[in-house]
């Protein structure tokens, strides 16, 4: 996939989260990692790329197709994508399987039997079939996040967008989730990932977009970025993260 952003601006009140962000990935990029310090704009850019937020200015293109700013058209784009956040966002009163089937039926218009079959397929794929009747509170953090990934994959999304999916997990649970994401990437799923997990990004990403202060400072193949970052901010960021690892 080829992702492009031209002078994208997004504000939250007086705070400018994206300040004319510009970048383009290579068309060969399959997994794009958004990296940078906290507050740099990663999560906001991820939401704009997925159609979850509309920018005040600028344009985003995916494989040459400009994302619309008109709300109804933007909603159609949003429904083509899948999102996973650090807080899981599973419905606490529903079983794991129901968390997957409900959006398939209510949002995507599938019938109950097709939705149940798709849910079971994904739960088996992600090692969760035996837990399908449990509610989120009965699952570990890693299981809940894998369930959230299954729900995001259920409608066969064009893009899977992951926003800090492991930041609330311990190392064992993090490993569970990262294994799943790696398998998805190897299977051809197009992924945009905002993360501080540099070790994982180094091994799974094809392309890195580095942000700080709401601006994109680097957009390069991942191997080039990790071998020799071009800007001081990226060098300082990578050096700070690796100092105690």
Where on the chain are the PLM-derived regions?
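Helix-to-loop junction immediately C-terminal to a conserved catalytic motif
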Residues: 50
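Conserved ABC ATPase signature
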Residues: 135-139, 143
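A short, proline-enriched helix->beta-strand linker immediately N-terminal to the Walker B motif
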Residues: 154-158
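The feature captures the beta-strand-to-loop junction immediately N-terminal to the Walker
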Residues: 35-37
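ABC ATPase NBD coupling module
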Residues: 67-82, 112-113, 225-229
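Catalytic Walker B motif of ABC-type/P-loop ATPase nucleotide-binding domains
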Residues: 160-163
């Amino acid at each position: 996939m080829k992702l492009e952003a031209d002078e994208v601006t997004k504000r939250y009140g007086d705070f400018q989260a994206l300040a004319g962000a510009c970048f383009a990935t290579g068309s060969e990029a399959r997994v794009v990692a958004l990296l940078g310090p906290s507050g740099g704009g990663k999560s906001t850019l991820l939401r704009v790329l997925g159609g979850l937020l509309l920018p005040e200015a600028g344009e985003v293109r995916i494989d040459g197709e400009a994302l619309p700013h008109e709300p109804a058209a933007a909603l159609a784009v949003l429904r083509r994508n899948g999102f996973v956040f650090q807080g899981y966002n599973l419905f606490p009163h529903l079983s794991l399987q129901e968390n997957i089937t409900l959006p398939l039926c209510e949002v995507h218009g599938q019938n109950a039997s097709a939705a149940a079959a798709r849910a079971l397929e994904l739960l088996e794929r992600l090692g969760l079939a035996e837990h399908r009747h449990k509610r989120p509170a009965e699952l570990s953090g890693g299981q809940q996040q894998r369930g959230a990934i299954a729900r995001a994959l259920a409608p066969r999304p064009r893009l899977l967008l992951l926003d800090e999916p492991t930041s609330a997990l311990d190392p064992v649970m993090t490993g569970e989730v990262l294994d799943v994401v790696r398998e998805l990437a190897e299977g051809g799923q197009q992924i945009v990932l905002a993360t501080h997990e540099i070790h994982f990004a180094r091994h799974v990403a094809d392309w890195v977009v580095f942000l700080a202060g709401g601006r994109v400072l680097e957009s390069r193949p991942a191997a080039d970025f990790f071998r020799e970052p071009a800007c001081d901010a990226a060098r300082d960021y990578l050096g700070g993260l690796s100092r105690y690892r």
